[in-house]
Amino acid sequence: MGLMDLVKKAFLGATDEENRKNKEKMRAIFNESVPNGNDYKLIYCHMENFSNAVIVENTKHSNFIVGYKEGEVVVIPVNPDLLDYGKAIIFNKKNESATRTSMGYCIVSNPEISFQFVPITYEPALAGKGKYSVAVTQSSAEVSEFKNFFKKGL
């Protein structure tokens, strides 16, 4: 890893090589989990849930591959190194799902389950979150398109 890669890793959360490899892994996971996976646009989302006890603060980090196309959203929970992942959860009108945005969060839900997450452009390793997030960078345009999709609704 050269000096420029170290700088990118520190400030953007991913080197160009990590970004490329992780986006390929995300696509492979998605295509393995969802029929016709290439029909969906993909984005990485992260969520932190905080809980406070009297003395201890606990933070739970969650990572998701989110695929979306007109009328449907698919959420796949993943771990930060993309080695383990959960079952694909499909949201569409048939299962009474809805999407919305609120205070920077994207929310998808149906009567049985709901997810709230944040699509991120990058997660700086300097912030200490590198070990909890997938090392990937996404453009502001990608994130904006995703948020607009959620605002519009299914």
Regions found by a protein language model. Give the residues of each.
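Phosphoinositide-binding peripheral membrane targeting modules
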Residues: A53-S114, T121-E123, F149, L154
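Anionic N-terminal interaction surfaces
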Residues: G2-V66
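Non-catalytic effector/regulatory segments
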Residues: P111, F115-F117, G128, Y132
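Terminal and domain-flanking low-complexity segments
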Residues: L126-L154
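Polar low-complexity intrinsically disordered regions enriched in Ser/Thr and small residues
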Residues: Y40, E70, I107, K131-S133
